[in-house]
Amino acid sequence: FFQQDRHHIRKTQRKDALVKTEKEKRTGFIRGLFLILTLGCCLLIFLNSAADSEVSGKQSGTITEAPAPVVIPNYDQLSPGEQKTQKNELGSLVRKAGHCLEFMALGLCSFSFCLTFRKKNDRQGRLFLAFLSALAFSVLYAVSDEIHQIFVPGRACEFEDVVTDTMGILCGMLVLAGLVRAKRAKEAARQSSFTLQ
C-alpha cells in the first residue's frame, strides 16, 4: 500500500515538474518576444529621430499630400502659399501623432515585458511595480530621444515633445493595464462560480 502511495506521489511530482517546465518555457518565449518588440520600438524611434528635418519633412509631406484637400477646409480656394502653410501645419501634426504612436507602442511592449516577471497569484504588488518600471524606462528613453535630436541637423530638443511622448506611453500602458484587470476579474468570476457549483 505504502509503495503504491509513494509511486503515486512520484508520478504526481513528475507531472507537476513537467507542467512547471512547460509554463517556464512559455513564459521565457513570451518574455523574449516582448523584449525583441521593445528593442524594435526603440530602434524605430531612434532611426526616425536620426532623420534630419528635411528628410522628416518629406516623409510627413508624402503622407499629408493626398488627404490635404479633404482635411483642410476650402483647400482649393487657398493661394499656393497658404496651401503650403496649411500642409506644413498638417505635416507637423502628423509627425507629433506618429511620435505619440511610436511611444504608445513602446509603452505597451515594455509594460508587457515587465509583466512577464509577475507571478500569477500576485494580485497588486507586481502589477504596480511592472507599471512603474515600464513607465520609468519609456520616459527615460523619450528624454534620451529628445537629447539625441540636439545632434541631428534641423531638429531640436523640446520639452513639449517629451510630454507628448509620455502621453503616448501612458495611453499604451493604461490600455494594457485595463486588459489585465479585466482578464483578472473574468478569472475571479469564473473561479467563484466554479466554487459555488
Task: Tell me what each language-model feature is.
Residues 4, 14:
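Cationic, low-complexity basic patches in intrinsically disordered or flexible, solvent-exposed regions
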Residues 20-108:
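"…centered on the first transmembrane helix and the immediately adjacent amphipathic helix/loop
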Residues 40-45, 130-147:
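Small-polar-interrupted transmembrane alpha-helices in polytopic inner-membrane proteins
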Residues 102-118, 167-183:
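Membrane-interfacial alpha-helical segments at the cytosolic side of multi-pass membrane proteins
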Residues 119-135:
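Internal alpha-helical transmembrane segments of multi-pass membrane proteins
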Residues 142-166:
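Interfacial helix-loop-helix junctions of multi-pass membrane proteins
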Residues 187-197:
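Short, charged juxtamembrane terminal tails flanking transmembrane helices
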